[in-house]
Amino acid sequence: MAEYDHYEDNGFNSFNDSSQEEHQDFLQFSKVFLPCMYLVVFVCGLVGNSLVLVISIFYHKLQSLTDVFLVNLPLADLVFVCTLPFWAYAGIHEWIFGQVMCKTLLGIYTINFYTSMLILTCITVDRFIVVVKATKAYNQQAKKMTWGKVICLLIWVISLLVSLPQIIYGNVFNLDKLICGYHDEEISTVVLATQMTLGFFLPLLAMIVCYSVIIKTLLHAGGFQKHRSLKIIFLVMAVFLLTQTPFNLVKLIRSTHWEYYAMTSFHYTIIVTEAIAYLRACLNPVLYAFVSLKFRKNFWKLVKDIGCLPYLGVSHQWKSSEDNSKTFSASHNVEATSMFQL
């Protein structure tokens, strides 16, 4: 949703004609840029997360705690991106879907945002346990699977509870056009604090602590697996920092009511960093599923089953993959305690 909508009048109402002209230019830019980005994220997120869900449910037996998380993560991201077409339309025109849909979509949007971030945190902690406490983790897989399902249920419940302010106070109001949001300073402060804590600082802290120990552990290991795992760790950290840090920093600056907030350039920064932050819903399937050898193998099974292999010209690759299945099976026990089950 367009974060700037709730505040767009605050920074411009008292400005001169020149500033009003800049404001109109900004509105024109936002009407094109944000809806286009929303639709790109929607299409890519819909395809990527749907693939992960289909493969996880129909082609992959849940064998580890990470598998449980990797069913819930694309589900949360998938529902999240399905709200974006509504915000895209509202960005171009105005909110026409009524108050009930406003509260519903705000709730869905927020619940799945928190769920996605909390599951990312759990995946990070699980990887820490798998790598650093490999033997113990392998011996307690059955118990961890049960706990994983309980944890995922708790995550959805917690996400619902912390989303209640948006659901209760979300409303349709008029700021030059009809907008769906919440226009209460206290509620905005509570929402910001919750989003920053659960949606940024908690997963960031988990990544810093857990991945630091994981890297130290892997550096004492050897072979190809170590180097591959280290590359993926740095990629995960880089993507999270590059996509989430700018937007959260902008939200912090906006909450201080610093004078720079009233400048037109800051409003451009808000919507650009927001669009970048939403890219996580497209990148999560790549970072947390497609890096897995097992997942890629099941992906080609899906492609074969729907009859696309001849058209893609990959029948040779599929045959090669089938020939290597014994090698894959032989290495399964090693993968069970590896960094990303690669």
UniProtKB/Swiss-Prot annotation:
Glycosylation site residues: 16
* Gene Ontology molecular function, alphabetical: C-C chemokine binding; C-C chemokine receptor activity; C-X-C chemokine receptor activity; coreceptor activity
- Where in the sequence is the signal peptide annotated? none
Record's subcellular location = Cell membrane
Q: According to its record, what are the GO cellular component terms?
A: external side of plasma membrane
**Which topology term describes how it sits in the membrane?**
Multi-pass membrane protein
The reply on keyword Secreted is no
PROSITE patterns, alphabetized = G_PROTEIN_RECEP_F1_1 (PS00237), G_PROTEIN_RECEP_F1_2 (PS50262)
Q: Which residues cross the membrane?
A: 33-59, 69-89, 104-125, 144-164, 188-215, 232-259, 276-293
* Disulfide bond annotation, renumbered to this chain: 102-180
Question: What InterPro entries does the database record attribute to this sequence?
Answer: CCR1-9-like (IPR050119), Chemokine_CXCR6 (IPR002235), Chemokine_rcpt (IPR000355), GPCR_Rhodpsn (IPR000276), GPCR_Rhodpsn_7TM (IPR017452)
Instruction: List residues in topological domain: Cytoplasmic.
Output: 60-68, 126-143, 216-231, 294-342
Which terms are listed as keywords in the entry? Answer: Cell membrane, Disulfide bond, G-protein coupled receptor, Glycoprotein, Membrane, Receptor, Transducer, Transmembrane, Transmembrane helix
GO BP terms: calcium-mediated signaling; cell chemotaxis; immune response; inflammatory response; positive regulation of cytosolic calcium ion concentration
Extracellular topological segments:
1-32, 90-103, 165-187, 260-275
Main localization is membrane
| The keyword Cell membrane is assigned to this record | yes
Q: Which PANTHER family does this one have? A: C-X-C CHEMOKINE RECEPTOR TYPE 6, CELL ADHESION MOLECULE
Q: Tell me, in a sentence or two, what this protein's role is.
A: Receptor for the C-X-C chemokine CXCL16. Used as a coreceptor by SIVs and by strains of HIV-2 and m-tropic HIV-1.
Record family assignment:
Belongs to the G-protein coupled receptor 1 family.
- Protein's name in the database: C-X-C chemokine receptor type 6
Native species = Chlorocebus aethiops
